[in-house]
């Protein structure tokens, strides 16, 4: 049976429009209430920004054989046990017949600050995955096949995220591919290496300008970290687990 990719490109464009629209709506609401956060924070604290991407992921799961699985989106049901910490809160969990089928993180990064936030996102992504796989090794989820672990990042496409960045490393040289790399390129390299090191089943990064609130246009950085690769891998895993578990 062919995998159903649920017209993911159109749904991704809708998700991009919703992302920027929700940020602006949250910012305007806080301004009107007189409780506006400083700078870009207002658009973040409103939440809901990645809901369009969440809906896309849900469609992939339901279209490829696990519409009847436990698909958790509510905060109270999104924790998994960790190894280095008691629990970790995920953005989406899929559980079927007592097995963890998928755990997915949906992240975004909007300017003007890219430096510190990039480092924080990197450390979080690596730590989260290492914690989960160590817990898996210790049978925190029982004896079962490896779950799908996905990481999807939406980054603002802006001059600040595309310009070359210099690094200071006085004792030992930085890896060549990082020298002068923009933050978008660094996210692409991060996602590639998260997959190469088997920390995530697949990791994707897309970039979109604020003007995409009207068009939904977005850019992908490489085939390995593309949205199609993410969606295809998820659809394949879901279909395989649906067939295995019946």
Curated annotation (Swiss-Prot):
Enzyme class: hydrolase
Record EC number: 3.1.21.4
UniProt entry keywords in alphabetical sequence: Endonuclease, Hydrolase, Magnesium, Nuclease, Plasmid, Restriction system
Catalytic activity, reaction form: Endonucleolytic cleavage of DNA to give specific double-stranded fragments with terminal 5'-phosphates
GO biological processes: DNA restriction-modification system
UniProt superkingdom: Bacteria
Molecular functions (GO terms): DNA binding; type II site-specific deoxyribonuclease activity
UniProt key word Disulfide bond: no
InterPro entries xref list: Restrct_endonuc_II_XhoI
Cofactor(s) listed in the protein's UniProt record: Mg(2+)
Disulfide bonds: none
Similarity field: Belongs to the XhoI type II restriction endonuclease family.
Summary of subunit composition and partner proteins: Homodimer.
UniProt-recorded name of the protein: Type II restriction enzyme PaeR7I
Organism name: Pseudomonas aeruginosa
């Amino acid at each position: 049976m062919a995998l159903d990719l649920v017209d993911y490109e159109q749904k991704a464009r809708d998700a991009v429009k919703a992302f920027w629209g929700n940020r602006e709506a949250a910012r305007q609401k806080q301004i009107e209430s007189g409780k506006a956060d400083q700078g870009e924070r207002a658009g973040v604290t409103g939440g809901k920004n990645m809901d369009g991407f969440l809906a896309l992921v849900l469609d992939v799961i339901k279209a490829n054989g696990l519409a009847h699985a436990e698909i958790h989106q509510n905060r109270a049901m999104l924790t998994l046990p960790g190894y280095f910490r008691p629990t970790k809160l995920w953005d989406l969990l899929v559980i079927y017949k007592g097995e963890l089928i998928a755990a997915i993180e949906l992240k975004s990064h909007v300017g003007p600050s890219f430096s510190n936030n990039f480092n924080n996102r990197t450390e979080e992504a690596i730590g989260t995955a290492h914690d989960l796989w160590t817990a898996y090794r210790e049978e925190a989820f029982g004896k079962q096949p490896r779950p799908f672990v996905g990481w999807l990042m939406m980054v603002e496409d802006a001059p600040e995220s595309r310009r070359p960045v210099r690094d200071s490393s006085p004792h030992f040289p930085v890896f060549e591919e990082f020298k002068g790399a923009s933050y978008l390129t660094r996210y692409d390299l991060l996602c590639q290496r998260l997959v190469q090191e088997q920390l995530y089943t697949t990791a994707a990064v897309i970039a979109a300008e604020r003007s995409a609130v009207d068009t939904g246009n977005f850019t992908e950085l490489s085939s390995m970290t593309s949205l199609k690769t993410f969606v295809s891998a998820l659809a394949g895993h879901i279909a395989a687990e649906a067939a295995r578990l019946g």
